[in-house]
Every structure is written in structure tokens, then in C-alpha cells.
Amino acid sequence: MKRAFFLVLLLAVAAGPVLAQESGDPELTIAVEAFRKALIDPTQVNLDKLTMNELTYGHSSGMIQDKAAFEQALLSGASDFVSIDLSQQTMHVVGNTAWVRHLFSAVTNDGGKPGETHLSVLMVWMKQKGQWRLLARQAVKVVQP
């Protein structure tokens, strides 16, 4: 009996990441992809549509921006993404709130200075009036081998 219990427990733990990935919402997946594209080609309209007024946007450097500062950095070119690749994405929806985790690799040209970044990102989304909008985002640097 103990053996069966531990086998079930092991299977439940192993299935956790798979279940989290499958508990997403197709509309949320579309919103995350739209946000990725908006970071590369930002406009006031697409950023406003995808983010909440209460946005808190945490960078891996420790800098935290509100919505206005986040948008200003993108629209001015101070933060300039040439390309972005998201991988190992998982998501979980709880009511009208969801979290999304992924690895974020980007080629940048911040203020005209070429570079690249590799991050682990956690995003919190809320569904308002049938649309997913970003409420919070926090990134940490990923050490590359």
C-alpha cells in the first residue's frame, strides 16, 4: 500500500509542470504572443491594449517601472528589442487571473547599443471585459553556460 501511495505521489509531482502548461487559455497564449510582438514593434495603442494602468514591470537589474515609464522606454527607443524568443512557457489560469513563466531571449539595441539578454520571466495577467491584460512582470537573469 505504501508503495502504491508513493508511486501516485511521484506521478503527481512529475505531472505538475505538464498540468500547469495545459491549464492555460488559448486567448492568454495569444495575448502573450501579442505582447512579445508589441515589445519588438511598440505603439501606444498596442501597449495600452495589452497592459493595465496599474502595471508594475520589474527588470532583472532591479529597476521597477510603472506603466508610463515602461511605455516611454519602449516608445523612445531607450529599450529596443530587435528580436525576442520565448521558450519553456508554462501558464496557469485561476478565475480571471493567470500567471505565465517562460525563458526570454532577446537581441537588443537599447539606445543604439547592440546587445542580448537571457531572462527567466514571471508575468501576471488579468482578464478584463474578455481581454487578457498584463498586470505585473518580473525578470531575473539566466546564467548562460
Model-derived features: positions:
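Sec-dependent N-terminal signal peptides
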Residues: 4-14
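Sec/Tat signal peptide C-region and signal peptidase I cleavage site
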Residues: 16-20
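A beta-strand edge to alpha-helix "cap/lid" segment located at domain peripheries
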Residues: 21-49, 56-145
